[in-house]
Amino acid sequence: MEDLKPSAANSLPLTLLGFLERAATVYGDCTSIVYGNSTVYTWRETNHRCLCVASALSSIGIGRSDVVSVLSANTPEMYELQFSVPMSGAILNNINTRLDARTVSVLLRHCESKLLFVDFFYSDLAVEAITMLLNPPILVLIANEEEEEGGAEVTERSKFCYLYSDLITRGNPDFKWIRPGSEWDPIVVNYTSGTTSSPKGVVHCHRGIFVMTLDSLTDWAVPKTPVYLWTLPIFHANGWTYPWGIAAVGGTNVCVRKLHAPSIYHLIRDHGVTHMYGAPIVLQILSASQESDQPLKSPVNFLTAGSSPPATVLLRAESLGFIVSHGYGLTETAGVIVSCAWKPNWNRLPASDQAQLKSRQGVRTVGFSEIDVVDPESGRSVERDGETVGEIVLRGSSIMLGYLKNPIGTQNSFKNGWFFTGDLGVIHGDGYLEIKDRSKDVIISGGENVSSVEVEAVLYTNPAVNEAAVVARPDEFWGETPCAFVSLKPGLTRKPTDKEIIEYCKYKMPRYMAPKTVSFLEELPKTSTGKIIKSLLKEIAKNM
C-alpha cells in the first residue's frame, strides 16, 4: 500500500468553518439565535450575516495572520464573530470583559491586534485602553439602540471607524470564506490569567478546534437541534467551542447579557432550554434563587468544569431538574478533555454517594488520546490508589500549538511528548481522575482564573507590605476566592486595615482579582530555605 498517498481530494485541511454553511442548508428555517424580546435569527440569516461581516473585514484589509479582537458580552454579534473573523482568514481573539483598561491594552499590544469589535456597553473601557497604545487597532462599535436607551450610552462615537451594522450592509453575502492553507494554521488566541506582567496567549489551530468541537458534542451526547443557553461567557476559551458545536447540530443559541437568576429561569421556561454550561458558581446562584421554589418543567443538562461543585449544591440542583455533568479542561486544551462518565450501576447508590462521585473530574473524553498523573521527580505514573498525588499530563489533538511569543513557556510545558498542566491530581482505583491542587497557583473564582503570583506582585507594591502570599480560600458561592496573608514593615506610624489593603488592590488591578480576605501575620511561615509555606497558609484559609 506504499503507493497510496494523500491527494487534494482526501487531504483538505480540517476546519469547523463549514459547520455554518451546512447549518444554513440543513436547518435554514430553524431558529439559530434568540436574544431579548425582539431579536430572532434563523440559520440562513446567521450565515448571511457572518459572510457579510467576513467580506467587509476582507475589504478593509483584514486577512490571513491578522489578529481581530472582540470585547463583548454574550450577544448575537459576539456569537457571529466566532465565525466571521476566521472566515475572513484572520485569527480570533476574545477578550475578558472583566479586565481593566490597562490589562486590555497589554493584550491588544501583545497579540498585535489590527481591529477591535466593541460591545457598546464596554466602549469606555475600549477607548481608555487604546489611548495607551502607539498603534491602536481599528475600532468597530457593536451598537444596540434598544439597549442604549436603557442607560449605557456611547460617549465617544468618534473614536469608532465603523458600526457593526454597517459592515453587514456593505458586505457581500456571496463571499467565499477563506479556507485555511493548513489545518495547523492558527484560528484563535486566548489569554489565560497572568496577563499583566507576562501575557500567556494560547494559540490553537483549525485542526485542534475542529477535533475538540466534535469531541465536546459526542462526550456530552448533544442531540440535533438542542436549545443552548449562553450562561458561559463566550470570551472564556471561545465558550469551550460550543459556538461552533451548536451550529454543527442546528441548535438554538439563547444569548443573554447578564447572569441574573430570575431571568435565567424565565429563559429556560420560555424557550425550552435543554443544555447550558457554566462555572460551579452558576449552579450555586440558580440553586439559591427564589425562582428555584418550583422544579423545572423538563430536565436541563448542565455541564460544569473547574473546581468541584459542593455536594450540597449538586444535590439541590439535581432536585430542581438539572442533570449535572462535571469535567476538566484548560484554555490550553480548548475545552473539556476529562469528564465524569457516569456508570449505570451508580444510579443505585445513595444521593450523597452519587454527588461524591460526580465531584471527581473523571476519565478522558472519547476524542482525546492520553491522560496520566506522574511523579514530578521520576516522571513515572503514580499508583492508582486515589491518594498518591502527581502532576496531570496530557496528549491529544486539541492541545494548543503553544504560547504566543513565549518560547520558554511553551518549551517548559511540552516535555517528553507530554503537555504538563501544572495541576496536581490522583487516579482512583477505577481509573477516574480527581484534581487535588493547582501547582501553578491559579485560583478559580467564579469560573475565572486568578493568578496568585500576580496578586502578590500588586501587594508588594504597597509601601506598608513586607511579605505577601495569596492562596485560595474555599467559598460556597464563588468556589474559591483570593485570600492574602500579609506581614507589615516594622516601624509604621500607622498600620493599614484589611479593607484598605483590599481597596488598594482593586485600584491596581481588575476588581475580581483582588483579595476578598486579608489576614495579618507577624511573619509568614517559611521553610529552612526561606520559601513561604503556602500549604500551611491554605489550611489556615480553609478554617477561617
Curated annotation (Swiss-Prot):
Class of this enzyme: ligase
Stated family: Belongs to the ATP-dependent AMP-binding enzyme family.
Pfam families assigned to the protein according to its UniProt record, in alphabetical order: AMP-binding, AMP-binding_C
UniProt superkingdom: Eukaryota
GO molecular function, one term: ligase activity
Biological process per Gene Ontology, one example term: fatty acid metabolic process
Organism field: Arabidopsis thaliana (Mouse-ear cress)
Tissue: Expressed at low levels in roots, leaves, stems, flowers and developing seeds.
Name the UniProt record assigns to this protein: Probable acyl-activating enzyme 8
Key words, A-Z: Fatty acid metabolism, Ligase, Lipid metabolism
Role, per record: May act as an acid--thiol ligase that activates carboxylic acids by forming acyl-CoAs.
CDD domains: ttLC_FACS_AEE21_like
Its EC number(s): 6.2.1.-
InterPro entries: AMP-bd_C, AMP-bd_C_sf, AMP-binding_CS, AMP-dep_synth/lig_dom, ANL_N_sf
